[in-house]
Amino acid sequence: MPPGEQFPRCHTRPVATIPGVSGRVDRLSRELAEDGVDAFFVSSAVSLGYLTGMHEAGGERLLIFAVGRDGRTRMIAPALSATQAGRMGIADVRPWRDGENPMVHVDDLGRDWNLRSAVIAVDDDMPASYLLALQEALPAALFRTGQPVLSRLMRIKDQSELDLMRRAGRIADEALPAALAACTQGVTERELASILTAEMLRLGGTPTFAIVAAGANGAEPHHHSDDTPIREGDVVVLDFGCQVEGYNSDITRTIACGHATEEAREVYRLVFTAHQAARAAIRPGVPAEAIDRAAREVIARAGHGERFMHRTGHGIGLRIHEEPYIIEGNASPLEVGNCFSVEPGVYLPGQFGVRIENIVAVTSDGHESLNAEPSPELIVAS
């Protein structure tokens, strides 16, 4: 669900110490050659982190990591970042200082790699200011999105990535009891979200978001925590997550404050049943839309089909939302190493909402949950 404001990325360690990273540039260059692309220009912290382990974006200062179809690499970076780039194992770094024109280095790159009339892919997160400047510097080049190429690599996690995601999931799981203990009448959504954030930080994660939606606010899937006080009997949706070395967790649990009505318990059981039905359908080769359908059919049969108005899940990794998307119309088959959320929900306007979310990884014989299993019954915090 929505990540809200991101906390700053602050993790960096040399490529040589990050299992799996060193081969990613080679795999990307092979994909570029197969797709007829001459070079890929990366500028986002996520894409750069995936390829090099250096989680940094240039912001107002131009920072580009170029990968050629022949495997060559070069970084054009602010002098402020050049030392870090070298430490990450990037051999060819062209630094520029404030007051200098970084496009001189782009012109050199175009000449050295014969890119002046080439096909150049860029990541979808590249700032428009970067792209416009690149198009002006290389006017005969054809620029296109490179995200489909990179997504093909990023959607399949290796064991080192899965280990980091398990750790992030475990931290989120272990933060939940603090929220349960603090969920009493009068505490505000914002205060409860702050407790979750502090607990994830204490446990060693980098908090990325914490959303608390109490009572009628829980019927708004995109609600952001505010100063609404939690009341006795409120159903409360908790959606939160953290990062470990850039890899994300994302968990949603629904609880009740003090006591729960039978209607709330019934809706919770329905959503839990839909969650389990979706999980049971996960295996390699199954179309992503089949997982969505499995959850949706359970809720529709109970008469709440119109109250489940979002997709069943989204991929997750270095991005909180990435491929594969678990939605009707996505016939792409699931593959071993895909990681995504399973998060059906029912939202009753003016009353409450219920959502249950776990992150799963597709395995050869089904799936693995990367965080603890949800309760089959609505938990009452007292």
Regions found by a protein language model. Give the residues of each.
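Active-site neighborhoods and metal-handling regions in enzymes and metal-associated proteins
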Residues: 2-382
